From Swiss-Prot:
Compartment list: Cytoplasm
Record lineage: Bacteria, Bacillati, Bacillota, Bacilli, Lactobacillales
Keyword Lipid biosynthesis set for record: yes
Name assigned to this protein: Glycerol-3-phosphate dehydrogenase [NAD(P)+]
Pathway: Membrane lipid metabolism; glycerophospholipid metabolism
């Protein structure tokens, strides 16, 4: 692929790791953020120490506080900002972007209030500047592993297969490989909802339960993710792929996962506000739990794990009692994933 200019909006851990992937592939990368100290550190020291203490970035990776500068002549734009500010940043992009570009996002969440997927938000806010359909970049991927060039396989999903293949070629190399998919609903819901299950798996660990319990919550969590996704129009097969079960495994079993760590802390009895303060990073699973619970209630979808996590976080229920309460739920067939 010829050299491309890519603007990455959000110099967090994942945005920085993806910047390195693109730089390794010979593309021109510009990171945009709004914290002067961080931007200066990336440009001066070639580090992003808040996320990666021992990683030195290539000097070719540049960062800026100026959104217009970041977007100038960009062939592709990658959103990697927290879900809650995606619409705000998209509005800002729409005001300064003066040409059409391929727009991607690599965030995982659902917008509070509207319940919208992130691709829908981007379509609504910057439709005039889209060169193609939105492309979703999602899958089992710890930034801590990608940044050291560990093998990573994820998904590029778009209703426009040509756009998905463009992004596949843009990112893929000897350690980072993308597979295409046209089921945007499935890929986005899988990426968002697995964070809830990761909180649950972490909570089990914090409470002292073993691998049997963790395997159960991950497996039954996949069932309820699939139930809701299919109700929203997804292909159930998507949930058996990289962006589904793959992402659920990596997020629901690893200390690298901030959602898992948050759940573990909740299980140990720590307060949510203290957990968020100590992490210093967005825990998407917390807000996604509320959105998913509201959607499930509205559509009548059975999501017992999501409900248990919701009641613990938002209604003050004891997390151990909420989880153990599921053991007395009505008997069901394992094959009732769709009901």
């Amino acid at each position: 692929m010829p050299k491309q200019k890519v603007a990455i909006l959000g110099p967090g851990s994942w945005g920085t790791a993806l910047a390195q992937v693109l730089n390794d592939n010979g593309h021109e990368v510009r990171l945009w953020g709004n914290i002067p100290e961080q931007i200066n550190e990336i440009n001066t020291n070639h580090t992003n120490s808040h996320y990666f203490k021992d990683i030195v970035l290539d000097e070719a990776i540049k960062a800026t506080l100026d959104l217009k500068e970041a977007l100038a002549d960009a062939d592709a734009i990658l959103f990697v900002v927290p879900t809650k500010v995606t619409r705000l940043v998209a509005k800002q992009v729409a005001q300064v972007l003066d040409h059409k570009a391929v727009v991607m996002h690599a965030s995982k969440g659902l917008e509070p209030g509207t319940h919208e997927r992130l691709s829908t938000i981007l379509e609504e806010e910057i439709s005039a500047q889209l060169r193609s359909e939105i492309v979703v970049v999602s899958g089992p991927s710890h930034a801590e592993e990608t940044i050291v060039r560990d093998i990573t396989l994820i998904t590029a999903a778009s209703k426009d297969i040509t756009a998905a293949k463009y992004v596949q070629a843009l990112f893929s190399n000897h350690y980072f490989r993308l597979y295409t998919n046209t089921d945007v609903i499935g890929v986005e819901t899988a990426g968002a909802l697995k964070n809830i299950i990761a909180v649950g798996a972490g909570a089990l660990h914090g409470l002292g339960y073993g691998d049997n319990a963790k395997a159960a919550v991950i497996t039954r969590g996949l069932a309820e993710i699939t139930r809701l996704g299919v109700k929203l129009g997804a292909d159930p097969l998507t949930y058996s792929g990289l962006s589904g079960v793959g992402d659920l495994i990596v997020t629901g079993t690893s200390v690298h996962s901030r959602n898992w760590r948050a759940g573990a802390a909740l299980g140990r009895g720590e307060k949510l506000k203290d957990i968020e303060s100590n992490m210093g990073m967005v825990i998407e699973g917390i807000s996604t739990t509320k959105v998913a619970y509201e959607i499930a209630q509205e559509l009548g979808v059975y999501m017992p794990i999501t409900s248990a996590i919701y009641k613990s976080i938002y209604e003050g229920a004891d997390i151990k009692e909420s989880i153990l309460g599921m053991m007395s739920n009505e008997f069901r067939s394992e094959n009732e994933w769709h009901s």
